[in-house]
Amino acid sequence: MQTLHDTSFASFEEKKSTFLAYLCPIKEFDMLHQQLKTEHPKAAHIVWAKRCLNEYRQIVENNSDDGEPKGTSGPPVLNVMRGFELVDVGILIVRYFGGIKLGTGGLVRAYGSSAKEVIAQANIIPFVFKETVRFSTLY
């Protein structure tokens, strides 16, 4: 499994639509999502996917198409994250519509390519399980 420390960014263009992709640690995900909504009020969509480990070391996944046709944006991004075995991270992709419809296949390819591009730009590191342990001794 892999993760990252810092947020990374990449942009991708497909048939005049612009895709702005952000990969961030899960701790920053909600704050970044709100920030992007504020910074990009005219964006057509803000699609996201995230993967994290729960307290039982199970991978919990979620995604949103944010108004794109069902299954054409969030799931492809999530599948890319699975392929790279990323955990405790989220990807947000802001889309500005360029006037040319991409179709369902085009959307799947564009969102998947955006996710791959932002991962390629990121400083990916191995994921290490960490636990806090307290102990005391007499001396």
What are these regions (language model features)?
Residues 17, 43, 85-87, 129:
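Short flexible coil/turn linkers enriched for glycine and charged/polar residues
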Residues 125-139:
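Short glycine-/aliphatic-rich beta-strand segments at the starts of folded cytosolic domains
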